[in-house]
Amino acid sequence: AASDVYKRQEDDNTVARQTMPSPAQTRFVLTGNKNAYPYDEFYKDDDELTADIVAAYRQVIADLYAAGCRNVQFDDCTWTRLCDKSVRERLGWSDEDAARLQQENLDVINAVIADQPDDLVINTHICRGNFHSTWLSSGGYAPVAAKLFGEENVDAYYLEFDDDRSGDFAPLAEVSGDKQVVLGLVTSKRPELEDPEVIKARISEAAQYVPLDRLCLSTQCGFASTEEGNKL
C-alpha cells in the first residue's frame, strides 16, 4: 500500500526521514537569479511566485504524509549566507536587504509549516555548503538568531558546529519554545576523529543556552552531499 512506503524503512530504532530543499532555498534560487530562471512571463511579482512555492510544498508534504512519512527535513543554505559579511558584500546586500531577506525566508517557511498534522515532525538543517570538503559561507548564527531560532516554527534545528567558522553557542539563547537543537559537532569534512572529551565539553557549553534534554549530537553535514563526496 502507498501508506507503507516509509513504514517499510522503519523499525523500533529508526524513523524514515524525507529531506528536501527548504522553501526559502527554492525561493532564493529563483528570485536571486532571474537570468537563469526568468519567471516574469508566469508571475506578475515575487509574491505570486512565493504563493505557488508555498502551495507546491504543502501539496508535496500532504502526499508524503499520505505515504506514511512523519519526518521531513528542510535543507537550507539561505540563512548562513546572511551570517557571512563577505557573502553579503559580494552579493551587494545592504543591512536593509539582509533584514528583508530574513523576513522573506521566515514567511515562506512558516506558511508551509502552518497547520500541518500534529504527528508530522518538521526539522531544518542550516547548512554552510558541503562540496568536496569545502564550503559556501562562514560566520556565527548571531545575525539571524532572533528570526531563525526565535520565530521559525520547526521542531528542531540541525546546526553545524564543527569548527570556528560556525561561531559560538551564544545565539542558541534565542531558541524558543521546546524546540530541539542537534549539535553538528562531529565533522564530515575531514578524516580526523574528534576527542570524545572535547565533544562532551562542547555539549556542556551549549547546555548553558539550551537545556541538555533538548540537545542531540550529530555530524555537521552529510558525508557526500554531492557525488564528489568529501576528502575523507
PLM feature spans:
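Short, small-residue-biased leader/transition segments that mark boundaries at the very start
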Residues: 2-6
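Short, well-ordered coil/turn segments that N-cap beta-strands
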Residues: 12-16, 68-71, 117-122, 153-155, ...
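Acidic, His- and aromatic-enriched active-site or binding-groove loops in soluble protein domains
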Residues: 37-58, 90-113, 143-149
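Short glycine/threonine-rich loop-to-helix capping motif typified by GTGT followed
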Residues: 83-98, 131-141, 169-175, 195-196, ...
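Active-site-proximal loop/short-helix segments
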Residues: 19-41, 67-100, 125-132, 218-221
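Long, well-ordered mid-to-C-terminal structural blocks that present hydrophobic/aromatic surfaces
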Residues: 96-105, 111-164
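Conserved, mostly hydrophobic/aromatic
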Residues: 8, 64, 124, 148, ...
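Catalytic-face loop-and-helix region of soluble metabolic enzyme cores
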Residues: 143-232
